[in-house]
From Swiss-Prot:
Sequence positions that bind (6S)-5,6,7,8-tetrahydrofolate: S113, L114, L115, P116
CDD domains: FMT_core_Met-tRNA-FMT_N, Met_tRNA_FMT_C
EC identifiers of the protein: 2.1.2.9
Gene Ontology cellular component list: cytosol
PANTHER family linked: METHIONYL-TRNA FORMYLTRANSFERASE, METHIONYL-TRNA FORMYLTRANSFERASE, MITOCHONDRIAL
GO molecular function: methionyl-tRNA formyltransferase activity
InterPro entries: Fmt, Formyl_trans_C, Formyl_trans_C_sf, Formyl_transf_N, Formyl_transf_N_sf, Formyl_transferase-like_C_sf, GART_AS, Met-tRNA-FMT_C
Gene: fmt
Transferase as UniProt keyword: yes
EC primary class: transferase
Name under which the protein is recorded: Methionyl-tRNA formyltransferase
Length: 315
C-alpha cells in the first residue's frame, strides 16, 4: 500500500465514528482522537460520551476533549502529535489557522454535499428540501473559511423520491469513508489534484430550527412533501391542532387543483388526510400526536376524527 500516514482524527457523532472505523482498518496510524466533551443526554441527563469517543476507547486510542482549540495549551496538544494529516468529520469545533497548518499535509474534511453547493451545517436536509436530483460527499483541504477549501475528491449518489434525511445520512456514511481512504492514498502518493471551488455556484445550508419545520400551508404540496422528508428524523415537520404539536412522518402529493384556502381539510379517510396547500393537495399518511407513537392516518382518525373535519382549516 501507500505510505502509512500519522493521522489525528477529529469528529463527534455516529457519522464521524463510521469514518474513524474505516481509518482504523486502512493501515494508517491513527495517533490520537479529538472529540466533543461528554454531554448530558436522555431523561436522566446523564453525561454521555460521543460515538467517536466510545469507538476510540474500545480501540485503545488516546482521546482529547477540549472545549475549544483556541487556547495555546490545546494547540500544543496537536503540535506535539507531529501528524502528517488531521482528518475532520463533523467535529463541531472551529480549527484556528495555527492548527490547520500544524500537520505536514494540513487538515482535510469530509463534507456531506457536492461542494460548492450546500456549504454549511445542514447540507443533507437542504439538498432534499430543494429537490436536488443528487448529492454526495466532498473531501476538501480545510482553510479558515466555512467549507471554502480546495476540493480533493468527490463521490455522488442520486436522491430518490423516497429518501429522507435519515436514509441519505446512511448513504453518505457509506460513501464518505470510501472517498476519505482514496484521498489519503493520493495525499500519501503525492497524486492529489486540488480543485478550487467555483464561487458562482455556492449555496449555503443553514442550520435547521424546530420552528422552521412547522408546516406552512401556503407552500406547494410538492415543497411540503420534500420538507417532510428533509426534516425526518429531525427536527420533524409538525402542525398544531388544539394547541398540541402533531409530527408528520410521511405524506404524498395529489396533483389535483383546488380553490380551497391553504390548510383546508378536503377529505379524511383510509387513504389519508387530504389538505389544500398553496399549490396542489398534500395527503398526510403517517402522523404522531404528542406523547404517542407514529401511526397511520387511518388509526389517528379512529381516535381523533374530530381533528380532521372536512372544511376545517389547519394553521
Amino acid at each position: 500500500m501507500s505510505e502509512s500516514l500519522r493521522i489525528i482524527f477529529a469528529g463527534t457523532p455516529d457519522f464521524a465514528a463510521r469514518h474513524l472505523d474505516a481509518l482504523l482498518s486502512s493501515g494508517h496510524n491513527v495517533v490520537s482522537v479529538f472529540t466533543q466533551p461528554d454531554r448530558p443526554a436522555g431523561r436522566g441527563k446523564k453525561l454521555m460520551p460521543s460515538p467517536v469517543k466510545v469507538l476510540a476507547e474500545e480501540k485503545g486510542l488516546p482521546v482529547f476533549q477540549p472545549v475549544s482549540l483556541r487556547p495555546q495549551e490545546n494547540q500544543q496538544l496537536v503540535a506535539d502529535l507531529q501528524a502528517d494529516v488531521m482528518v475532520v468529520v463533523a467535529y463541531g469545533l472551529i480549527l484556528p489557522k495555527a492548527v490547520l497548518e500544524m500537520p505536514r499535509l494540513g487538515c482535510i474534511n469530509v463534507h456531506g454535499s457536492l461542494l460548492p453547493r450546500w456549504r454549511g451545517a445542514a447540507p443533507i436536509q437542504r439538498s432534499l428540501w430543494a429537490g436536488d436530483a443528487e448529492t454526495g460527499v466532498t473531501i476538501m483541504q480545510m482553510d479558515v473559511g466555512l467549507d471554502t477549501g480546495d476540493m480533493l475528491y468527490k463521490l455522488s449518489c442520486p436522491i430518490t423520491a423516497e429518501d429522507t434525511s435519515g436514509t441519505l445520512y446512511d448513504k453518505l456514511a457509506e460513501l464518505g469513508p470510501q472517498g476519505l481512504i482514496t484521498t489519503l492514498k493520493q495525499l500519501a502518493d503525492g497524486t492529489a489534484k486540488p480543485e478550487v471551488q467555483d464561487e458562482t455556484l455556492v449555496t449555503y445550508a443553514e442550520k435547521l430550527s424546530k420552528e422552521e419545520a412547522r408546516i406552512d400551508w401556503s407552500l406547494s404540496a410538492a415543497q411540503l412533501e420534500r420538507c417532510i422528508r428533509a426534516f425526518n428524523p429531525w427536527p420533524m415537520s409538525w402542525l398544531e391542532i388544539e394547541g398540541q404539536p402533531v409530527k408528520v412522518w410521511k405524506a404524498s402529493v395529489i396533483d389535483t387543483a383546488t380553490n380551497a384556502a391553504p390548510g383546508t381539510i378536503l377529505e379524511a379517510n383510509k387513504q389519508g388526510i387530504q389538505v389544500a396547500t398553496g399549490d396542489g393537495i398534500l395527503n398526510l399518511l403517517s402522523l404522531q400526536p404528542a406523547g404517542k407513537k407514529a401511526m397511520s392516518a387511518q388509526d389517528l382518525l379512529n381516535s381523533r376524527r374530530e381533528w380532521f373535519v372536512p372544511g376545517n382549516r389547519l394553521v
